Amino acid sequence: MKTKYKLLNVGLFFLSISQSIVLASDPYPGYTLFSIGRTAYLYDIDKKKVHQWKVSEGSIQTSPYLLPDGSVLFPLNKGGFTFRPGGAHPSGTFQKISWDGEVLWDFSFFGDNFTPSYDVEPMPNGNILVCAGFEERRRPGKLFEIKPIGKNGGEVVWECNVSEKLGDLVQGYINSVSFNPSLDQVLVNIQAPARTLAIFDHSNSKANLIFKWDKGFTGRLHGGCWVTDRYLGTNIQIPDADKKLMRIGNIITVSNGDNQAVEVNPKTNERVESFNYEFSEHQGSVQRLPNGNTLIVSGYSQQINELDNNGKIVWSLETSGRISRAYRYGLKYQGVLNKN
């Protein structure tokens, strides 16, 4: 077994993953998913394209999500709605496309008084979480859990009126939703002027507000997500996750304008850490990786960077077009096993 060590000025640190010991500052091995235009791309750690999925109509909003069966969930803008949710880019249509390119599910969800914004979250039970805004720009809107039915149908099985729970003082629109299967809780981040992170109880229909953080943000919040040892959108445990380095249970978000990725501990109600980084004015994403590194996208840029816990860039990919978000999936994730 090959052992690597790195001497830091605060001592000797090493990270145990599986049966080998690797540097915490090494890139986390896996596949990175992002989209440009109508196409989603999967790249390996050597920056080679492994696979791609293409939608036939509409435009992909924010990011696609790779599911355990190798299919991809897309939030799409195919038109048909009457207004933009709180001024955000709308989606309104959700598609699942298989590894081989077959459309497995194509469902449109909007109404006269609500339109989904650009994010969606896959769930372990096969459902999806959708954030939708009202025509009135100052109110955040609602969360909907939708159960897919057939090839073109869906049923709302849970909802949370975020505007009602947070009150009239919180203004802005929801632009990110993230589910924590271990806690059965939903995280949202709300755009300016509120600049708020909020957590809601998903375990029952009351959907009570559990946590709210609105301290010290002056930028535009995007891509808020849980730090979890589960693969994104699943309840499948990541086998090589280092819970201590990851700081499981914290939440992280991009704060454009502040030029930071901000991490908060909802248990202690404290800001844990911030990564200084050059962000754009729009969108972006941040993901804590199983080795403690952090994957960051500057929204509407062509750059994906992986930073170690000292803020050093250890892996970078320049894409061929502008992207909104990107997510890394480990080598042992079911969605990529035996697919390439």
Label every model-predicted segment.
Residues 1-10:
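Bacterial N-terminal signal peptides that target proteins for export
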Residues 9-19:
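Bacterial N-terminal signal peptides
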Residues 23-340:
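Histidine-/acidic-rich catalytic cores in large beta-rich domains
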